[in-house]
Regions:
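Active-site loop signature of alpha/beta-hydrolase-fold enzymes
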Residues: 48, 113, 146-147, 179
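Glycine-rich loop(s) and the adjacent beta-strand/alpha-helix scaffold that form part
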Residues: 185-192
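A conserved short coil-to-beta-strand element within the FAD-binding core of flavoproteins
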Residues: 12-24, 140-153
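Rossmann-like dinucleotide-binding cores of NAD(P)H-dependent redox enzymes
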Residues: 81, 90-146
């Protein structure tokens, strides 16, 4: 009702696949065309993939949806060593849950502190201390060289410098990439 009072049509659950700014028209995935005066593009995003050799192997997990969590859960019985790449909120939450289940968990963070892009040093230090206290092995300033593959699945993570970490399960939590392809195709400029 509040949206209607502001003369705004909210259309949740519709996927826009193309935009024609000159015609003030957007085309939905099902072919429906929607005309607009002004449009707000709330694009959402997809998990960033690991840009390292082996980063696209089956069995490299991300956490974005319930289905992602279910896929991780399905592999937990046979996973003793879990490597989480990314020391943001997603990676730390996963580490907390998994170490609580008795798993050996290593968190690899490229920055020199956890949560570096979203929190100040004091909060980063607090999360690091609490996770270490619970048994999470945290490696800061970690650079991933490759995912070690065995039988088409991840078997470990190789760090720059040559150290290998065993991994029965790898979770990547390194942010999201906005889904802006239809806007770029319509002529919008992508900020870099």
């Amino acid at each position: 009702e509040a949206w209607a009072e502001l003369n705004i049509d909210l259309l949740p659950g519709r996927k826009i696949v193309s935009v024609d700014p000159a015609a003030h028209e957007a085309r939905c995935e099902d072919g429906e065309r929607i005309t607009y005066g002004k449009m707000i593009w709330a694009a959402g995003g997809a998990p960033r993939r690991l840009p390292a050799p082996g980063g696209d192997l089956a069995g490299i997990h991300v956490i974005r949806t319930r289905a992602d969590v279910d896929a991780i859960r399905a592999g937990l019985d046979s996973a003793g060593n879990i490597v989480i790449i990314g020391g943001g909120y997603i990676g730390l939450e996963a580490a907390s849950v998994l170490v609580g289940m008795g798993k050996r968990v290593v968190v690899l963070e490229a920055q020199e502190r956890l949560l570096a892009r979203v929190a100040g040093p004091a909060l980063s230090a607090f999360y690091e201390k609490e996770h270490r206290r619970r048994g999470v092995d945290i490696r800061l300033g970690a650079k991933i060289e490759a995912i070690i593959e065995k039988g088409g699945r991840p078997a470990g993570v190789r760090l720059a410098g040559g150290a290998d970490l065993p991994a029965d399960l790898v979770i990547v939590g390194i942010g999201i990439a906005p889904e802006v392809e239809p806007l770029i195709a319509a002529g919008a400029e992508e900020a870099r």
